[in-house]
Regions:
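PLP-dependent amino-acid enzyme catalytic core
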Residues: 2-336
Length: 336
């Protein structure tokens, strides 16, 4: 079964404003700033997948857009704010998806974008960053090393540093997914969200717990990159020395305290899943939905696979958050 412990206490829902950094009015306003190509993404029931998993399953598809992930919902807000402030350049650290999204949003608004990424990031993600005319610097080591380098460059060049999850705009952009879920006519009782730095989990969780508090928000993270999940259960920041997972998009080691505080308020549970279940999820999404996804997008399916009894009789929504995947690696996972 999925590795989990008794859920930590969550915020009091439906009785007042949740105490987080996020704001519902700003999230509603964000829809007027984000390019419509990233909004109102498909959500539909997948009966074939549901039969295999033993529950009703719907997917929220965040990959049918120019950057193949949900990240541009946040970078659209970031880039808009920076141009309003008269900024001309920006730098970020990224495992691939944020860098691609910021490059797209920045180019649209005339911002010079620099991305610092781990050298071992999937080649497909790095190639797409280059294709968007961003300056790309590769570093040895993991995402945390890239984050340190990006901060150093920002200070040295005097440009704005964009930090995913810490910059609340990245969370509030992702939160527009929650608005769309809350507006769906179909009834669902559980949402499974990939957990890395926490932008999507806190954003979507905040909206759901504000508007439809009965929906259970479950965050899912690989057992090989457990820092945020362990922090959620311990209710304090827990760091790790390394990560070991194919889900590079969620492989952080140093949770951000402010983001953890938000997550403690809006998430009902956080679970860890094994690599074998992530790979099985990738395979099932291809076979039963026709979707080619990156490992992070299969975490929700993996969570159901590891704890089937928990989800029997439920209507589960899993957010398909990205499809920027190295094809050689994908073929190894799917056809092994």
């Amino acid at each position: 079964m999925a590795l989990t412990v008794k859920a930590a206490p969550s915020g009091v829902y439906g009785l007042g404003v949740l105490k987080t950094r996020l704001d519902l009015d700003r999230i509603h306003a964000a829809r007027r700033v984000i390019d419509p190509i990233f909004l109102s993404t498909p959500m539909y029931r997948c009966d074939a997948l549901g039969r295999q998993l033993g529950c009703t399953v719907s997917i929220k598809l965040e990959t049918a857009n120019p950057v193949r992930s949900f990240k541009a919902r946040g970078t659209e807000l970031v880039a808009s704010l920076l141009t309003e402030q008269g900024r001309t350049a920006v730098v970020c650290a990224s495992a691939g998806n944020l860098g691609q999204a910021l490059s797209w949003s920045g180019r649209r608004r005339g911002l010079n974008v620099m991305v610092v990424a781990p050298r071992r990031a999937p080649a497909a993600k790095l190639d797409r960053i280059r294709a968007l005319a961003a300056e790309l610097e590769l570093v040895d080591g993991d995402f945390e090393m890239a984050r340190e380098r990006a901060a150093s460059i920002a200070q040295w060049r005097g440009v704005q540093l964009v930090e995913d999850s810490l910059d609340v705009e990245t969370c509030e952009g992702a939160a527009t997914i929650g608005l769309e879920l809350a507006g769906e006519e179909s009834t669902f009782d559980t949402v499974l969200i990939a957990l890395g730095g926490g932008a999507m989990a806190t954003g979507v969780g905040y909206v759901l717990k504000t508007l439809v508090p009965g929906v259970e928000v479950i965050c899912v993270q690989p057992i090989g990159a457990p820092a945020m999940t362990r922090s959620w259960h311990e209710r304090r920041v827990i760091t790790t020395e390394s990560t070991d997972t194919i889900a590079d998009g969620v492989a952080g080691r140093y949770p951000i305290p402010a983001v953890l505080d938000d997550l403690l308020t809006v998430a009902d549970d956080a679970v860890l899943v094994h690599e074998s279940s992530i790979i099985a999820g990738i395979q099932m999404l291809l076979e039963h939905t026709g979707l080619v996804v990156e490992p992070s997008a299969a975490l929700g399916v993996a969570a159901v696979l590891e704890d089937r009894d928990r989800f029997v009789g439920r209507h589960v929504v899993t957010v398909i958050c990205g499809s920027n995947v190295d094809l050689d690696a994908y073929h190894r996972w799917v056809y092994r």
